[in-house]
Each structure stands twice: as structure tokens, then as C-alpha cells.
Amino acid sequence: MAQMNFGGVVETVVTSKEFSLEKAREVLKNETIAILGYGIQGPGQAGNLRDNGFNVIVGQRPGKTYDKAVADGWVPGKTLFSVEEAAEKGTIICMLLSDAGQIAVWPKIKQYLTPGKTLYYSHGFAINWNDRTGVVPPADVD
């Protein structure tokens, strides 16, 4: 592990020496990683995971960004779904929608966050200000 300084905060960071790509593939081999949103962060994160051998699907509403996902090789009905369907199919749910998008889709996807699934955010306005947004994950979701 390494000690790294992030803006004056020193954190211990796990490196590839302790947790290799091969180990990550083994640990996640039975998981479906659902990337919700294909705007700013989605293409990079989804493509990186896919290119490194992980089972990845994308959830995106129809429109220009959906068309971009198709152009990038995501296949409708196979690796590209509606946001709701991707949330249902995924075991690891990556919330990459805009803050406003997260708030808008939350009522539609929370039913798919079932026990044992993992939910993560790359930016967290909606979850950090849940008293204002209503985005409150179930207690049995990691």
C-alpha cells in the first residue's frame, strides 16, 4: 500500500501490487457491473472495465448519448439497456448520472436495489444531501 497526499489529506491507497488486475477479475467474475449514465464519466469507466475483461452493461435513456453508446460498441438488448433495466440486471450499480439525473431516476430504480447488490457513486450530491433529494439507499445494499 502507498501513502498519498490528496489536497493535504494523507490516505492509504491500495495499489496494483496488493490487488492486481487478475485478482480483481477473479473477485468480480460473477458480477455484472451496470454503468448508469453514458454522459461525461460513463464512456471512460464503462470502456475501461469492458476492455479489461469485466462483465459490464450500460443503462442510458434514448437520445444522442444512447446513440453514442451504440457507436462505441454497446449492443442494445445485450450490453445496452434502459437505466431501469440495467439497474435490475446489475449486481454492482455505478451511478454516473448527473446530479439532476440521479434524483429523477431514483424513484424508478430503487426497487431494483435488492439485498446483496452494491451501489456506488462517482460524485455524491444526491446521496450526501439525501434529506433534500430523497435518494436513500436500502440498508441491505452495500
What positions do the PLM features span?
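Glycine-rich, N-terminal phosphate-binding loop of Rossmann-like dinucleotide-binding domains
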Residues: 96-98, 123
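Conserved acidic residues
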Residues: 90-91, 117
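Helix-to-beta-strand junctions that scaffold the AdoMet/dcAdoMet cofactor pocket
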Residues: 113-114
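Short acidic low-complexity segments
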Residues: 74-90
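N-terminal Rossmann-like NAD(P) cofactor-binding module of classical short-chain dehydrogenase/reductase
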Residues: 93-94, 120
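NAD(P)+-binding Rossmann beta1-loop-alpha1 motif at the extreme N-terminus of oxidoreductases
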Residues: 2-75
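Rossmann-fold NAD(P)-binding glycine/threonine-rich loop
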Residues: 118-142
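Glycine/threonine-rich flexible loop motifs
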Residues: 101-108
